[in-house]
UniProtKB/Swiss-Prot annotation:
CDD domains to which the protein is assigned, alphabetical: TBP_archaea
Pfam families hit by this protein: TBP
Cross-link Glycyl lysine isopeptide (Lys-Gly) (interchain with G-Cter in SAMP2): where in chain: 53, 63
Keyword annotations of the record: DNA-binding, Isopeptide bond, Repeat, Transcription, Transcription regulation, Ubl conjugation
Record's protein name: TATA-box-binding protein 2
Translocase keyword on record: no
Coiled coil residues, start to end: none
GO biological processes: DNA-templated transcription initiation
InterPro entries documented for this protein: TBP (IPR000814), TBP_archaea (IPR033711), TBP_CS (IPR030491), TBP_dom_sf (IPR012295)
Cited PANTHER family: TATA-BOX BINDING PROTEIN (PTHR10126)
Positions of Sequence repeats: 10-86, 101-179
Annotated organism of origin: Haloferax volcanii (strain ATCC 29605 / DSM 3757 / JCM 8879 / NBRC 14742 / NCIMB 2012 / VKM B-1768 / DS2)
Amino acid sequence: MSGPADSIEIQNVVASTGIGQELDLEALADDLPGADFNPDNFPGLVYRTQDPKAAALIFRSGKIVCTGAKSIDDVHDALGIIFDKLRELKIPVDDEPEITVQNIVSSADLGHNLNLNALAIGLGLEDVEYEPEQFPGLVYRMDEPKVVILLFGSGKIVITGGKRTDDAETAVEEIVERIDALGLLG
């Protein structure tokens, strides 16, 4: 039998790394085919990989943020491509720079419509933000795992703030248990 945890899909993984030295982004933009650098709009250089599909935001400080990947493996693969491109340009990069996952955004479907008004009261106002005039979802801040869950009347949810892939699964199991205990699941 499949449940809400089986419907979890990672939508975005954001990770950071660095190469430990300052970069000349103007020169890098010229030397790196496909790089996008417009300092009037954004202080970093944007370099997109196609396989896996991700974007690296490369900053003058040598810090790099990878976003848009669909898995932690994809983050490592995309950053590996970027590290190799930098090495080809004679920019020294450690063999295996440390990569830190900052945020994993996942979605899931609880399979039932939700009464968000009743849920806002039942989950406890101290952990909930629900202003339907401002945003159609209920924002629920969970302590363990430390994630934010957006719940929608359709039963669809978004989990953000995870650091590990299993944070979403734990969060879905926890929220289903809480909603069920309130008698508000289906």
